[in-house]
Amino acid sequence: MPSRRHALVLQDRRAVRIVALVLLALAAAYQCFWRIADENIGGDESTYVRAGFAYVHGAFDQNREHPPTAKYLFGLAQLVGGEGATAPRVLVSALVVLGAAVMFVWLRAEVGFWAGWTAAALWTLTPRGGSGARLDRVALLDPVMVFFALAALFAVWTWTRTGRWWWLPLSAVLMAASVTSKASTLVLVPVFLLAPLLFRQWRRLVVGGVVWAVVFTVTVVALYAPMGIRSAVLYMLAFQEGQNENGHLAVIAGQTHQFAPWWGNWWFLAQGVGLPVLVVLAAGVLLAVVVRPDRLVVFLAAPLLLLVAFYSVAAKIALPTYYSAWTPWIVLLAAVGLGRLAVLRPRPLTGALAALLVVVALVGSIPTARAVWQTRPEGVARLLPLLRSEGIRDGRIFFGAITPSDYDQYVGARGVRDVDDAPFEAIVVGRDQRFPLPQEVTDLLRDERSSFERVRLDRIVVWIPDGEIERDADGELDVR
């Protein structure tokens, strides 16, 4: 009888786990893919998508300031799914789901089923703001870089744990794909020596390190070869050095910075994930460090510390998407911490507390789920249909308080931001304080308010004149 009861308990437990996985898969599919084609196309995304399409057709002159691999994949996706941003977006979201699978398999083996499930849930469902409803629903380089780095570190850990030789070269190939998607993860290369060090596998450290380095180098060269590796790398280094020296305008905590403060990417992290999720992640990481820290915790903390140091100290700029490089390691550590909390005594209490923290994070994801549900073209994406309905089919459009990358792909050469380019058929005003309105435009909108129809399109305002906006001999703007 006891054995039969035990079998029924195991069967019930298996059923609960299957249901949990199915529910997570459905929620992840929704969060990652629902209305994925309806997001506005950002400037960087448009650049990478166009460059990828050019690369697979043999033209490598675009976007040489970044490595090519992610753009190769974007180009291949367009060959399969059609030209444009949708197919690359589907690819990026698929990599997010694959990353969740890697996390689940990794932590399920090392900590337990629910730790793996928690990592996958935190990775696929929680907010990551910075571009669109979630920054890994658009075709940016960062999510591709992150996936390959995550898979590479999982592979080298598995090689160390199992001794199966083929995991080692696979890890090197995956890491080469990460570095040649975006170079930031180059700082993680020392971590690949850490795994055999942690297990005191000295022979594997020496022999495996040499094999890994050779495979990594050969793969990097092969991936860069179509671009011309020497010229491409030199151009990339010169560009990145110039950007670090000259800075990059960013609005952080309400202030415009040319050179970001060291905490800039931390601020974007807090804004991107939201307070409830941030608290849960911080608690989970703290628990991982405090409750039975082991080799796995050290191995996961190493890439987090290296990337935080790079983005907080070495890099002089901060952008809303940069923190995404840290998030897989934060998520993994948090899941480890919550998983180990759940098995402390008294288990009913600690298990309930761990479950409560996971629920808080999932509840904190509801705004992202709502944003995904409500995703549609907005702002500048709706501008040209509005102007056509007003009878404006050509002519220049003046843009102020809005970054050029937001409108270039929608209006092309019609979009200008210099009053010397008058006449204009309309004025579009955004909210980006990095690009303030010229005084001439401010004066025109104040003094000749009655000459304009004012239409709000989400976060922009379109001023449609009852004539044409021209510049007179005194440099003033008038509606004529």
Go through each PLM region and give its residues.
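Transmembrane alpha-helical segments
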Residues: 337, 351-377
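Transmembrane alpha-helix segments characteristic
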Residues: 23-27, 173-175, 213-214, 280-283, ...
